[in-house]
């Protein structure tokens, strides 16, 4: 996969991972590079939800561990990250607000394997994200690209090809473990 961003040797971009199951069976690991030099706030929000560093208002770790991919559309994208409600309606940030502003639209949705923020309109970024499975130029200037899959695109393809009903996977697609490499 061609990289839109090359990390410098001095400050390499962080790499995070998801270990995924489908219906309780292991699918494997997805590793993602976060573009901290271009989208520092967006990348840090995602990174902390991968590591569990972020705490809920009750002081408990919050993040992607044990959350599900709730929306899967073949030849488009796989969407997850709603650890609040699990259905695409929840939003949380590490910044103490339910949402944060679009950081920028420098990077484009021009290839499969891009990590981008799901939202419900301008400046409504939270915890939800999606991974593209094809180029999606119609999302440019609407969703913030902040990373890319560097390993495990085969796992993304397995998720993309799982059976769905109204774009919801028929079996749970779960992030059973996540963190930073």
Swiss-Prot record:
Gene3D superfamilies: Cyclophilin-like
GO biological process, one term: protein folding
GO molecular function, one term: peptidyl-prolyl cis-trans isomerase activity
Cellular component GO terms, alphabetical: cytoplasm; nucleus
Alphabetized UniProt keyword annotations: Isomerase, Nucleus, Rotamase
Cell inner membrane among keywords: no
Catalytic activity: [protein]-peptidylproline (omega=180) = [protein]-peptidylproline (omega=0)
Residue ranges that the Swiss-Prot or TrEMBL entry lists as coiled coil: none
Protein EC: 5.2.1.8
Organism: Aspergillus oryzae (strain ATCC 42149 / RIB 40) (Yellow koji mold)
Entry similarity comment: Belongs to the cyclophilin-type PPIase family. PPIase H subfamily.
Function (record text): PPIases accelerate the folding of proteins. It catalyzes the cis-trans isomerization of proline imidic peptide bonds in oligopeptides.
Family matches, as SUPFAM superfamilies: Cyclophilin-like
Residue span, PPIase cyclophilin-type domain: 17-180
PROSITE patterns: CSA_PPIASE_1, CSA_PPIASE_2
Enzyme class: isomerase
Classification via InterPro entries: Cyclophilin-like_dom_sf, Cyclophilin-type_PPIase, Cyclophilin-type_PPIase_CS, Cyclophilin-type_PPIase_dom
Cell compartments where the protein resides: Nucleus
Protein name in UniProt: Peptidyl-prolyl cis-trans isomerase H
């Amino acid at each position: 996969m061609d990289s839109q961003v090359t990390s410098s040797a001095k400050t390499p971009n962080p790499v995070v991972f998801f270990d995924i199951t489908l219906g309780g069976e292991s699918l494997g690991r997805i590793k993602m590079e976060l573009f901290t030099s271009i989208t520092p706030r967006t990348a840090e929000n995602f990174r902390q939800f991968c590591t569990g560093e972020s705490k809920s208002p009750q002081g408990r770790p919050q993040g992607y561990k044990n959350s599900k991919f709730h929306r899967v559309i073949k030849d488009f994208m796989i969407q997850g990250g709603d650890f609040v409600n699990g259905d695409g309606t929840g939003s949380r940030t590490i910044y103490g607000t339910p949402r944060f502003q679009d950081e920028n639209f420098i990077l484009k949705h021009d290839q499969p394997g891009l990590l981008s923020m799901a939202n419900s309109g301008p400046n409504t970024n939270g915890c939800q994200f999606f991974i593209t499975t094809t180029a999606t130029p119609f999302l440019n200037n609407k969703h913030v690209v902040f990373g890319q899959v560097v390993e495990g695109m085969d796992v993304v393809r397995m998720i993309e090809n799982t059976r769905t009903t109204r774009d919801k996977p028929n079996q749970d697609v779960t992030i059973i473990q996540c963190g930073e490499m």
